[in-house]
Curated annotation (Swiss-Prot):
Annotated catalysed reactions: an acyl phosphate + H2O = a carboxylate + phosphate + H(+)
Pfam families: Acylphosphatase
Protein name: Acylphosphatase
Keywords: Hydrolase
Amino acid sequence: MTTKHVLVSGIVQGVGYRAWARQEATRRNLTGWVRNCADGRVEALLEGEADAVDDMLNAMHQGPALAQVDRILVEEGNNDDDGPRSTHFEVT
């Protein structure tokens, strides 16, 4: 099991990025969350098998059709700082 904390920059709010991320993460059997940041970025915590997380990170560079991803910052995540472990992937 691996956990990644992700910040996505670009045109990623108001284009369905969070709903798309939830659908894609669920399809890959990942748990965690995704949310909008006040500065216009999207933040996510991804948990799951390493290959599935890597695949999701690759997909996040593209995003949904209306998104324009400029940059993704990925750090090793620690879910302990973000509350109890989730059993699903949610938009917060």
